[in-house]
Amino acid sequence: MHMLKTGVLACAVALAGCGAITRTTYEAPQVALPAQFEHAQPSAATPAPEAWWRAFGDPRLDAWIDMALARNPDLATAGIRVRRAALQAQLAGRALLPQPGGTLSTGASRPLSGSPRSTLETSSATLSVGWELDLFDRLGAQRDAAVFEAQASEQDRQAVALSLAATTASLYWQLALANERLEFARQSLEYTRRTGELVEAQYRSGAVSSLERREARQALAEQQALLSQYTQARAELRQALNELLLGAEAPGGEPQALPTGALPAIAAGLPAELLGRRPDLRAAELRLRASLASSDAATARYYPTLSLTGSLGGSSNSLLDLLANPVTALGASMTLPFLNVGEMRLNTAIARNQHEEAVVNFRKSLYAALAETEKALSARTELASQEQAQQRVMQESAEITRLYEARYRAGQVPLRTWLDAQERSRNAQLALSALHLAQLQNQVTINKVLGGGWQTP
């Protein structure tokens, strides 16, 4: 027996340096990245800050996003997942440490026949320590996989926060546009009402027919319907805000118009920087590392396992004298799971296959991120051009409306010509506002696809 224990311990010493055999060196997946985004504009601006929305210089927007981040249940749930993953990582790490144990028992016995028939009371106690020597780094690989998963969970939380901030900013500006359009609709309704009063006076004097009178009334009804539509749209946005803030009142009230200042400049940077910015890509790479560690752990399961145990205990007829004569024991055991060669090969192949799948999915996510960024940057350029063109359209339509009004008052054109000019002018103004909103939302999208970042305010 002594020779057997000595042999087992000798094997442990011989195998102690073999842990590196089963660990695979991580190499980032090779992907072909362009040197720069095709639609990136040269800029001396610094990279987007973590709290990217503060670059707009709108304290009310800052307060809205701060409240959403503080109250959102999805973000709170993500934080709970982070804490749970961290606890699981700690639990996996404890497997590398000696595991203490102990037992305490007491009992009584009495013979059923014979003499003497006195009761015999006995007690025993044992303190034990077990330690699995991680010869082939199986436990270390499992711990690393759990740590990577915990880190990935933190990136998931940051991705939720980034998306939440983007959603809040988008809703904020949609509500601003809704209020702006409502005010514009009220002004248009008043202008149309004054036009109708002019036509009504002309009709009573016989200057125009009932056709012009009905056209003026139709235009007024259309503006009243439009005002009602905008009121409904704002009510729906307010309900969405109520859900976002869980019923809390929006801090600072509602924005009444879209911001008119220049948009914050964004330095797009190199595509490779996406890996360091986007939390979803960081999470994907961390899970790639976790899958590699899990694959190594699956392989290491089929290597010999050596466990050491030690105990200190005693037994006595008297509980107080339990450890008066302690008994110690030291043992070692080795299992040889590699003898099941068929199962080992299949499970190892399955683990490697899962890692290969994770590599493919990571590459897919990266290229999708590159495409999203190119699309957003291209839209930024085109939206700026469209806004300039729409500015000219609005200016010209306003001047055309003014000229047709003068001609109508002079009796040179029919009422319908003037009313159509008014409609085109209103549509041009609305289209310009819609483009402005699209630019703001595109700015949010760019910050999001570049991993604008988030830290607890």
What does each model-identified segment do?
Residues 203-207, 408-412, 449, 453:
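A short glycine-centered flexible hinge/capping loop motif at secondary-structure junctions
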Residues 65, 124-128, 172, 271, ...:
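Membrane-embedded beta-strand positions in outer-membrane beta-barrel channels/transporters
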Residues 139, 154-270, 379, 403-406, ...:
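Periplasmic alpha-helical coiled-coil/stalk elements that build and connect Gram-negative outer-membrane
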Residues 61-63, 122-124, 170, 215, ...:
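Transmembrane beta-barrel architecture of outer-membrane proteins
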Residues 262, 377, 431-457:
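Acidic, low-complexity, intrinsically disordered peripheral segments
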Residues 2-70, 147, 231-276, 282, ...:
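Terminal intrinsically disordered/low-complexity segments used for targeting and assembly
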Residues 76-77, 93-94, 133-161, 211, ...:
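Sec/SRP-type N-terminal targeting helices
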Residues 41, 47-56, 103-128, 142, ...:
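Small/polar, glycine/serine/threonine/aspartate-rich low-complexity segments that form flexible
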